Amino acid sequence: MGTQTTNTASQSTTNAQGNGSLPLPQSDRDVEHLQGHWLLARIGKRVLRPGGKKLTGRMLAKTELEGKDVVEFAPGLGRTTQLILERKPKSYRGVDRDPQVVDIITKLTAENAPSIPTSCALRDAADTGLESESADAVIGEAMLTMQTERGKRAIIAEAYRLLRAGGTYSIHELGLQPD
């Protein structure tokens, strides 16, 4: 799978530092064919964190990242990616099925972490193609919520497969309870 994208869309966003203009993923699609989170991004909601930035910070603070091999599922526009890189991991690998996200993350990591080995694979979180037991931490933020039960199980199984003994799968998700 390649990581090339065509920048023909008029919708754009800034990178994690607010610099430059990058095309929004799926901005070439009409509203009826957008994934929900990219529709929200199109209308201005650029960060989807069920518990806000504070919960993201708590999650990352409780996950040992410095000097560790880190995988991030569905990094989106790279807001959490930047926070991960600030914690000086040994390596960073993103995994996303959207080629525009792969392009965004590839640029962001090259600009902001030139001394850290980084990559972003055009793959599904349920089938990353990464080597078994190759990560100390797997990060996923507000992505399981949008999956079917079968999809959730497959993604969790893939995170488990990637983790070394003693590794951590850190997530936070929406938790809806009926009244």
Task: Please place each PLM-identified region on the residue numbering.
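Conserved alpha-helix/loop element of class I SAM-dependent methyltransferases that forms part
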Residues: R49-E66
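Conserved class I S-adenosyl-L-methionine
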Residues: S170-D179
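N-terminal, positively charged/glycine-rich alpha-helical extensions of SAM-dependent methyltransferases
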Residues: G2-L39
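A short SAM/SAH-binding and catalytic strip from SAM-dependent methyltransferases
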Residues: A137-G151
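Class I SAM-dependent methyltransferase SAM/SAH-binding core
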Residues: V71, L77-D127
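A short glycine-rich, Lys/Arg-flanked "PGG" loop and its adjoining helix->strand segment in the class I
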Residues: R153-T168
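Class I SAM-dependent methyltransferase Rossmann-like catalytic core
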Residues: L34-G51
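A short acidic, Gly/Pro-enriched loop at the edge of an enzyme's catalytic core
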Residues: A126-V138
